Amino acid sequence: MTAKSAAAAARATVYGYPRQGRGRELKKAIEGYWKGRLDADALRTTATGLRRDTWQQLAEAGIHEVPTGDFSYYDHVLDTSVMVGAIPARHRAAVEADALDGYFAMARGTQDVAPLEMTKWFDTNYHYLVPELGPDTVFSTDSAKQVAELGEALALGLTARPVLVGPVTYLLLAKPAPGVAADFDPLTLLDRLLPVYAEVLADLRAAGAEWVQLDEPALVQDRTPAELNAAERAYRVLGGLTDRPKLLVASYFDRLGDALPVLAEAPVEGLALDFAEGAAANLDALAAVGGLPGKRLVAGVVDGRNIWVNDLEKSLALLGTLLGLADRVDVAASCSLLHVPLDAAAERDIAPQVLRWLAFARQKTAEIVTLAKGLGHGTDAIAAQLAANRADLVSRADSALTRDPAVRSRTAATTDADARRSGPYPERAAAQRARLGLPLLPTTTIGSFPQTAELRTARADLRAGRIDSAGYEERIRAEIGEVISFQEKAGLDVLVHGEAERNDMVQYFAERLTGYLTTQHGWVQSYGTRYVRPPVLAGDISRPEPMTVPWTTYAQSLTDRPVKGMLTGPVTMLAWSFVRDDQPLGETARQVALALRDEVGDLEAAGTSVIQVDEPALRETLPLRAADRPAYLAWATEAFRLTTGGVRPDTQIHTHMCYAEFGDIVQAIDDLDADVISLEAARSHMQVARELAEHAYPREAGPGVYDIHSPRVPGVDETAALLRKGLEAIPAERLWVNPDCGLKTRGWPETRASLENLVAAARTVRAEHAGS
């Protein structure tokens, strides 16, 4: 096909779309089902309606081929485990008794059965349920969900493309099941898994699928020759099947690298590449392999992970260079639109001119359709859209919101000394022990306590004008009083104020920092029914006034025990926001760090002896390729130290991280120079404690001893057993006892019981240690 004919054949498509509905109907229906207010039929009816509405909206917008199978009640990787029959033994009876309840039990656990481990989906803010596999795993085919959802779309008269997690990525994301040797490689199961995928593909073809999309984002990471050989074998086998649809292998989140020639040569009909994150590298690699003759190329030129309007002229130029490199060039976002909010048009509190800088899923869909039209019919066909887009880009570049000379002058004046603590850690630790007087194995929590219906009502009442600020603050003080009282009675050693005033650990600060915008309806799925509203970091950052000091000092006035000051760190402020793309991330991080440094200084001046600067996103924002990591870690750790570098030696700095594998960033954790770090560890059975020990980590650490993402209450013996496992790696004088993460999403009954058990377990193990 010539470049001209390839352009004429261009179509618009997307890989996936937000699941929740305009009013988060899916979240409400699922939680209603969990609480017994909705039955399974009502939940399924809601889900069917949401899928129908999404597909019809996409088709009406001009999307030629809508995705199916990307919808999920909880997680698409968990759906894949169900599809291939990889049900953990401890959950099989529940799944056999009731498939839906068993599905949710795998995701959330029950009082007696632990859930699957949950971790970040590559370097995004979405979480997936980690498959558990072993040498005895027997796969079986269950394509009912995939076939049914395809049938729903086809019944609407739409062209539909089922989306599956590819077999190589599925195995690379898996981990050894409990009781399986830690060095077991799930990829050794590929030959067992491929026949199941073959059956699924045959079922989908029989159901009417012309194309099936197989997502292989794991191939954008650094891969060994053995892993690349597995990818070659997988697609040689699947491509060689006779009873199958056409195959589109999709990669996203970065450049494809060494896997590109493997997939280019595979007997598949199409390849999807990310031209937002890895544009130059993917373009060069495509040219190096001679393009994709006879194949379909889906070009992800619209950024699927950020919310800024696309530079249409720049994207059209890139698309033009791709013509001639494939038999057909289609236009898409760089990844599933799951990672952005649904519709910017729903925002009412953002200035209209600023709103024109933003593109959520609906606007990105329009950009994709516009680009496909421009590619196929020429720029004259989209002249009006190009002119409007050009004006929006100029408006943003010239806006006073984006640049503050005072902020830029302060950032430029920072020195290396600003990012260093006063005194080496051993001296600081001695000063902190003398000041705090804590027992061995001190107990604490990560920060937040349950956000009750009463708290949400108070915020709603304030927004609606039913109460004034004084009335709202009175309610918050009452909640803080209850949280402090409970912690004292439970016997915790270092307390928190509970963050009752905070709707979200990033949004709370974003609302108080100049340069940020917040949304009303910009919800994005984090996991299951947990949705967040990432703020928009649009301009230079500064702090007009203290943000946390009044609440922290009020809490401290209620107790003689130390109360932690609680801040969100600069890297997490960036990672959990939609960040400006017009300057280097390191520069933006320094601006945020300096604003937070002012807050740290004010907390210390007010008498706060323990200050926690949370950085749960440090690991999850790590670039997917090793070559890109040193530069990231350099600015990320510097930003943390710039935040905390001004405190006295006897002020104890804590940090917290969750939901990640930490082995490859232990040196960076060390480089933060925090006095205490708490980490997620319960679901991974203290793996992180072992990783810290292997690195000879010299400071104090609190690997979590209970999983707060499940409603189950761990018993005293279970918690004590995890604590003893932690002691195998970390000396008692440096080990803290804490949950995995904050308690915001939990209910008060399970929170009380779990923390009381945590304190009892700490006392038990403390006594054992004293008697040994």
UniProtKB/Swiss-Prot annotation:
Cofactor(s) listed in the protein's UniProt record: Zn(2+)
Functional note: Catalyzes the transfer of a methyl group from 5-methyltetrahydrofolate to homocysteine resulting in methionine formation.
Residues bound to Zn(2+): 656, 658, 680, 741
Record EC number: 2.1.1.14
Residue numbers binding L-methionine: 446-448, 499, 614
Cysteine disulfide links: none
Family classification: Belongs to the vitamin-B12 independent methionine synthase family.
Pathway given in the UniProt record: Amino-acid biosynthesis; L-methionine biosynthesis via de novo pathway; L-methionine from L-homocysteine (MetE route): step 1/1
Gene coding for it: metE
Protein's name according to its UniProt entry: 5-methyltetrahydropteroyltriglutamate--homocysteine methyltransferase
Domain of life: Bacteria
Reactions catalysed according to its record: 5-methyltetrahydropteroyltri-L-glutamate + L-homocysteine = tetrahydropteroyltri-L-glutamate + L-methionine
